[in-house]
UniProtKB/Swiss-Prot annotation:
List of residues binding GTP: D23, H24, G25, K26, S27, T28, N140, K141, I142, D143
Species annotation: Streptococcus uberis (strain ATCC BAA-854 / 0140J)
Molecular function in Gene Ontology: GTP binding; GTPase activity; ribosome binding; translation elongation factor activity
Keyword set includes Protein biosynthesis: yes
UniProt protein name: Elongation factor 4
Amino acid sequence: MNSQELKNRQEKIRNFSIIAHIDHGKSTLADRILEKTETVSSREMQAQLLDSMDLERERGITIKLNAIELNYTAKDGETYILHLIDTPGHVDFTYEVSRSLAACEGAVLVVDAAQGIEAQTLANVYLALDNDLEILPVINKIDLPAADPERVRQEIEDVIGLDASEAVLASAKAGIGIEEILEQIVEKVPAPSGDVDAPLQALIFDSVYDAYRGVILQVRIINGVVKPGDKIQMMSNGKSFDVTEVGIFTPKAVGRDFLATGDVGYIAASIKTVADTRVGDTVTLANNPASEPLDGYKQMNPMVFAGLYPIESNKYNDLREALEKLQLNDASLQFEPETSQALGFGFRCGFLGLLHMDVIQERLEREFNIDLIMTAPSVVYHINTTDGEMLAVSNPSEFPDPTKVDSIEEPYVKAQIMVPQEFVGAVMELAQRKRGDFVTMDYIDDNRVNVIYQIPLAEIVFDFFDKLKSSTRGYASFDYEISEYRKSQLVKMDILLNGDKVDALSFIVHREFAYERGKLIVEKLKKIIPRQQFEVPIQAAIGQKIVARSDIKALRKNVLAKCYGGDVSRKRKLLEKQKAGKKRMKAIGSVEVPQEAFLSVLSMDEDTKK
């Protein structure tokens, strides 16, 4: 194709993504759009087609973004090329959302006609506005008995400030309103800007590792053209590769002769090393490079850290390779090697949030067959020492000696909780219990309230989300962003088994709750750790001070079984002998800590005030 034909083709391209809160019907809408445009034959169609990971389908959530090309013949008789970039809705995957939005010109905002706007809907809308996207509101699930489209239309205008007078009323499940959505995309979403004749600039928004073809890049072409046989170059590190294949996804990969400005597709170039590519990097041609890279993405900082250790220590290298491959596909995962006396060699990993951590652990166990032990998650604390230094510490075992600590700061988040009015009391009580500071409260409509709190991230990491859902019968929606570091009265609590510290069980706790928390864990461990041949004391300590203790009684053989009557001194002799043996065992014996013990530190049952 000559450059004029390419420019005409570019006029017909529409790149859009679908944004919504969890469960508002985003993946179902994507399915309907694929059916309507006949991208997927009815034989291949299955629910949540774009959620390709088993894990996504089981949990009913979207984790990875996906990019699909569709052809749609509009009412004006022209055929348009639509690129649908599917995005996750969960707060932990905001990074995935921001990456997909950067590759689009428009966004379809799906709002549930019964539930209305939720906290994550807002968060994603603001991301879309940051990227200057054309936003098309769609009110979904209008066939539900509880649907109230007019109220939701008003809500979109009041809360977000978008004109919702032309919002499409749709039901993705029943297939209502799908054509109107496609027509609006064609009419309202602008064609990609960009110059076909300029040097190639392609933004990598995702990548996957293929055992045969190496790393496959998913790109959005911003300027220029790329075709097989070209030599491409990464702008961040200057590495160059020969393109073997380019193409698009119609969920399946389909090879093409070229990818031109505005296209969303993949490039395979026999890239062997995972480390050579980075999501957010710019690809250009080696013989005609672009003068400067694209903006890319802002680097995401992990919020939650945890140690991952293989249960079989010989799987350490497998774990490293698995993490490298996952990192390729999930740019926000970070990891570095660490060792623990209790657990051996493993990695300290950084995640965006708890769901992200859960998903990574499950993917490692499923896709790479590695059995893992995971330590309690912690956040990054800033420690000001008496020497005037500031240390950033995410691992409790790296905490300096308490005598050298001047003050400790912990991250606070600004939490937005949207909740029906009747549950406001329960939410406020929960936030207060989690050391939250009340900021403000706005009424969205007669029934729904947006409550804003400043809460320490460490409190959210444990079980805030579960507690929030259960105390509001699942009606609350929640979104958070890091706001600042504040000084707090924090202490490090060590757990001692048989007098030895178990480094993997250490955790950071607020001084006020230290005693209760210590007591709770000691009692929990007592139930979980199997009885030994000798007595095992379990202690919780802050520095040198023991705050709680519980003993696991020894198992003992009945050495008096053979004595029928007889002198009491004979019995005493046997008991003393047994006692001496137990004492010797205790001196040299070590205690096996089962995996549940590490998990119990996580799921602190809050029978106490904490």
